[in-house]
Amino acid sequence: NPKLRVLIGDGMKFIRETAERFDLIALDLNDPMGPAEALYSAEFFQQCRHALAPGGALVLHIGAPVARPERVAELAQRLNGIFRIVRPYTMYIPLYGAQWAMAVCSDKLDPKSLTADEIDRRIEQRKLQDLRFYNGETHEGVFALPNFIRDLVNPPRLKQQARGRRLGVVRAAAK
């Protein structure tokens, strides 16, 4: 696809210096150790946000929720402090033999607002029928998070609101 451009190099330097705006920034990063640690910083995510075109999205893996739950929670919290919409999702990664968490981050694009029918229609329009994994149902499915992952990725204010609603129901039932 002529719209696709793959850039390999110093991501921090590139994102800091570019004046371009991107519809999508997909980060396939090393673990956040050593030199790669800066690529997981709030500063870098802010710079990525600035490099997005209106309606654009940043997509990245946020870790293995079973093996490193603290990393998933930390990154989700950091991203929620920068982007208006952060939608974590999970999938099994055969290479690692584990479920991994990713996130779509944007100020306008909400991938959960797309229905299975809309996804299937777009796949058909773009003549992508040979896809082996992705379809409308898998789109909806990857965003259906198990409770233990929800607990990791929900920002504290949402947890407080949810807890308040539950307590309100309990109080009302007790009266």
Identify the meaning behind each predicted range.
Residues G55, N80-G81, S113-L114:
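A short, hydrophobic/aromatic-rich structural module that often spans a beta strand
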